[in-house]
C-alpha cells in the first residue's frame, strides 16, 4: 500500500499525555491541521489543535462521523478502548487512512490470553508458565500447583490496574484466592475469565515500535515504574514515571537483550499474519522481563505506552507523519533519536490509585518550568468548574532530557520543587539507586 495523497489533516484519538506529545510532534509540520477526539477536555490538547470533539471513546460511529466531518487524511489511534471496539475497521470502511490495529489485531492487547496462546502455539519461547480459566475453582487449584507464586490477570482491559502479584499486592494465598473470586464476582476485565501465570523475577523494560505489516521501526528501550511508592512498594498504578538512557539500551541491558526482544516481537507479528491472513499496523508496545531463564514477555499493548511514549518522542528528531508515511509506503528510511537520557515523573493526587476521580489541586508557573528544560504533559482534564480532575488516569507528567539519567533527573526534581499543592510522586525514579 502507498499513501495516495498528501497528509494535511490528522486526527488523534485519545485524551492524555501521550496524545499531547503526539500532537506536539505533528505540529512541527506547519502545513498539517490537527484535530483531537477526546473523552475529557485536556487543556493542553485544546490549546494545540485546530479543532476537537468530546465524546465516548467507545463510540466508533461518533469517531467516524467526526473524522468525516473534518475530512481527515490520517487517523492515529493511540488509546485502547476505541481499538477494542473496532474503530480502525470502521474508519477504513470510509476510506480513511488509519495507523492503528484492526479489531482482530487489537486482541494482542485487549485479550491478555490471546498473545500468550498464539505464541505458545507457534513455539515462541518467551513465556512464563500460564493457563486461562473460565472456572474460578480450577484457577485457584492451578495457583496452588504453582505454590501460590503467581500473577493474577483479568483477561480484558483494566487501564493498567488489574494485574496483581503474589508477594506484592497479594500478600498470601488467601489474597490470591480472594482476588480470583473478585475478578469473577465483579466481572473485572469484562470477560469472565482469568489468566494465572507464574510470578517472574527480574528487570523490566519496554520497547515501542512503529509497525506496518512486515515493516517495523524500533525505538530506544524505556524502563517504567508502576508501583506507587519509592523502592517499588505499594499498589500498582498505570505508572508513576519512567526513564530512558542515551543510546538505545538501559543500564542493565546489552545489545543481545534488545535484539532478542525485537525478534520476539517480529515472530509474534509473523505468526499472527500466518494464522489470520491479516497484517498488524500501529504503535506496538512490548514489555519484557530479563530473568535468569532468559527474556520473558509480560504483555503487548497496541498503542504507545504512557509514560514511555513521552521519553521516546522527547528525543525523536523526525515527524510522526513522515515516519508513518514512509512506513506505509515501504520506504526504508532511518528514524533519528537524539543521544540523550530522559526522566519522566508523574505527580498524582494523594489517595491515588485507591481513590479515583479526584481534583488535582496544584499551582505552578509553566513558563518557569519550561525554561528549566522540563516539559509538562497532562493526563487530567478540566471539569465543569475548570478544575483539573483525575479519573482513572494520573495527573501531570514532567519530563526532561540530559547527557545522563542523573542529570535529567536533577532538572525534573527542581521543576517539581516549584509546584505547590497537595500531591504525591516517586522521588526515586531516575535516582542512582533505581538505575539498575
Language-model segments: which ranges?
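ATP-binding N-terminal substructure of ATP-dependent carboxylate-amine bond-forming enzymes
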Residues: 1-104
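Short acidic-hydrophobic, aromatic-tinged amphipathic segments that line or gate anion-handling sites
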Residues: 51-58, 131-135, 166
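A conserved helix-loop-beta module that forms one wall/lid of the active-site cleft
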Residues: 99-162
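Short, flexible turn/loop "capping" segments at secondary-structure junctions
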Residues: 155-157, 337, 388-393
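Internal nucleotide-binding/catalytic subdomain
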Residues: 163-293, 298-305
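Active-site "cap" helix and flanking loop/linker of ATP-utilizing ligase/carboxylase catalytic domains
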Residues: 258-285, 301-373, 383-384
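Generic C-terminus detector
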Residues: 385, 390-436
Amino acid at each position: 500500500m502507498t499513501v495516495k495523497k498528501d497528509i494535511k489533516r490528522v486526527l488523534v484519538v485519545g485524551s492524555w499525555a501521550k496524545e499531547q506529545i503526539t500532537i506536539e510532534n505533528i505540529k512541527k509540520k506547519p502545513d498539517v491541521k490537527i484535530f483531537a477526539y477526546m473523552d475529557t477536555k485536556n487543556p493542553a490538547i485544546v490549546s494545540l489543535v485546530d479543532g476537537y470533539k468530546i465524546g465516548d471513546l467507545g463510540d466508533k460511529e461518533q469517531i467516524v462521523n467526526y473524522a468525516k466531518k473534518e475530512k481527515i487524511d490520517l487517523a492515529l489511534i493511540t488509546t485502547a478502548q476505541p481499538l477494542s471496539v473496532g474503530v480502525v475497521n470502521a474508519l477504513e470502511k470510509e476510506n480513511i487512512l488509519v495507523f492503528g490495529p484492526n479489531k482482530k489485531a487489537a486482541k494482542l492487547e485487549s485479550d491478555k490470553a490471546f498473545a500468550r496462546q498464539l505464541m505458545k502455539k507457534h513455539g515462541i519461547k518467551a513465556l512464563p508458565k500460564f493457563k486461562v480459566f473460565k472456572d474460578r475453582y480450577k484457577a485457584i487449584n492451578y495457583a496452588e500447583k504453582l505454590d501460590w507464586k503467581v500473577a493474577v490477570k483479568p483477561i480484558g482491559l483494566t487501564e493498567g490496574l488489574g494485574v496483581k502479584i503474589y508477594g506484592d499486592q497479594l500478600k498470601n494465598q488467601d489474597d490470591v484466592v480472594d482476588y480470583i473470586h473478585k475478578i469473577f464476582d465483579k466481572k473485572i476485565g469484562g470477560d469472565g475469565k482469568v489468566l494465572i501465570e507464574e510470578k517472574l523475577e527480574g528487570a523490566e523494560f519496554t520497547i515501542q515500535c512503529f509497525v506496518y505489516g512486515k515493516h517495523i521501526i524500533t525505538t530506544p528501550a524505556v524502563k517504567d515504574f508502576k508501583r506507587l511508592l519509592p523502592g517499588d512498594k505499594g499498589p500498582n498504578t498505570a505508572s508513576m514515571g519512567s526513564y530512558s538512557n542515551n543510546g538505545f539500551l538501559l543500564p542493565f541491558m546489552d545489545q543481545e537483550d534488545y535484539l532478542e526482544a525485537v525478534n520476539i516481537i517480529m515472530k509474534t507479528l509473523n505468526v499472527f499474519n500466518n494464522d489470520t491472513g491479516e497484517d498488524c499496523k500501529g504503535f506496538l508496545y512490548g514489555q519484557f522481563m530479563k530473568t535468569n531463564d532468559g527474556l520473558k514477555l509480560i504483555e503487548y499493548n497496541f498503542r504507545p505506552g504512557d509514560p514511555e511514549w513521552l521519553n521516546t518522542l522527547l528525543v525523536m528528531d523526525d515527524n510522526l507523519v513522515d515516519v508513518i508515511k514512509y512506513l506505509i509506503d515501504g520506504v526504508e528510511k532511518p528514524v533519528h533519536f537524539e543521544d540523550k537520557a530522559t526522566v519522566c515523573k508523574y505527580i498524582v493526587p494523594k489517595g491515588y490509585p485507591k481513590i479515583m476521580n479526584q481534583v488535582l489541586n496544584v499551582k505552578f508557573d509553566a513558563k518557569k518550568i519550561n525554561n528549566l528544560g522540563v516539559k509538562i504533559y497532562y493526563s487530567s482534564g478540566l471539569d465543569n468548574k475548570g478544575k483539573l480532575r483525575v479519573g482513572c488516569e494520573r495527573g501531570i507528567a514532567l519530563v526532561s532530557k540530559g547527557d545522563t539519567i542523573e542529570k535529567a533527573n536533577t532538572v525534573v526534581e527542581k521543576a517539581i520543587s516549584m509546584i505547590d499543592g497537595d500531591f504525591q510522586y516517586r522521588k526515586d525514579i531516575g535516582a542512582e539507586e533505581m538505575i539498575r
